[in-house]
UniProtKB/Swiss-Prot annotation:
Domain of life: Bacteria
Biased composition (Acidic residues): 190-209
Disulfide bond annotation, renumbered to this chain: none
Region (Disordered): 185-209
Xref: InterPro entries: Rbsml_bL25/Gln-tRNA_synth_N, Ribosomal_bL25/Gln-tRNA_synth, Ribosomal_bL25_b-dom, Ribosomal_bL25_C, Ribosomal_bL25_long, Ribosomal_L25_dom, Ribosomal_uL5_bac-type
Keywords assigned by UniProt, alphabetized: Ribonucleoprotein, Ribosomal protein, RNA-binding, rRNA-binding
Biological processes, Gene Ontology terms: translation
Organism: Syntrophomonas wolfei subsp. wolfei (strain DSM 2245B / Goettingen)
The protein's name in its UniProt record: Large ribosomal subunit protein bL25
Pfam families assigned to the protein according to its UniProt record, in alphabetical order: Ribosomal_L25p (PF01386), Ribosomal_TL5_C (PF14693)
Any one GO CC term of the record: cytosolic large ribosomal subunit
Length: 209
């Protein structure tokens, strides 16, 4: 099956009280948007969403099985709203897609090998956390990965160094910085040395003459 299956029902657009009632009943309101199409308000079960997200994440294709519709709708999640305190899902925006048309989308960058950098005494300075790509919906990767373990202090990883799967084109400038490896700052080193000297002075004062 292409895309993770999600069950949904169409809903009427009502007042905020109705939306609050949905949330209390463990249902999540959502809207499906599409190019040249009217927005479709739907509701989904929070439990099913949490299960799918925990196992597969929220990126990639989702096949929406809408009650009363004969065919599933292929979609991507464009926005997830969560309660800032509890972290619970409160609203989703879906984008309907045509599997025969390429789409622009942002994809996260996953860095590996930071422990090796730290062993060398380097400090990771992260750059872009995501890049823009162009591909068919079914080829959209969950993330793009990069191994920084071989980088030395003073070296930089660029967008051009990312591992890109077949069928995916990166639109972000190739020279944009993904990560830089820095040396510990002299200022920090100086502060540490000063603290050590102060500690030695205190110990000297405590010793009896």
């Amino acid at each position: 099956m292409l895309g993770q299956k999600l069950n949904a029902r169409k809903r009427e657009i009502k007042n905020r009280g109705y939306l609050n009632q949905l949330k209390r009943s463990e249902q999540v309101p959502a809207v499906i948007y599409g190019k040249g199409e009217e927005a479709v308000p739907i509701i989904l079960e929070k439990r099913e969403l949490n299960r799918i997200f925990n196992v597969h994440g929220s990126r990639g294709l989702f096949s929406l099985e809408i009650e009363g519709e004969s065919k599933p709708m292929m979609t991507l999640i464009r926005e997830i709203q969560r309660n800032p305190v509890s972290g619970q899902l409160i609203h989703l925006d879906f984008l309907s897609v045509n599997l025969n048309e390429k789409i622009n989308s942002n994809v996260g960058v996953l860095l590996g090998g930071e422990e090796e950098v730290m062993k060398k005494g380097g400090i990771l300075q992260a750059g872009l956390k995501e890049v823009e790509v162009l591909c068919f919906p079914q080829d959209l990767p969950e993330y793009l990965s990069a191994d920084i373990s071989s980088l030395e202090i003073g070296e930089t990883l660029h967008v051009a160094d990312l591992i890109v799967p077949a069928g995916v084109e990166i639109l972000t400038e190739a020279e944009s910085v993904i990560a830089s490896i820095l040396a510990p700052s002299k200022a920090t080193t100086g502060e540490e040395e000063g603290a050590e000297a102060a500690g030695e002075g205190e110990e000297a004062e405590e010793k009896p003459e």
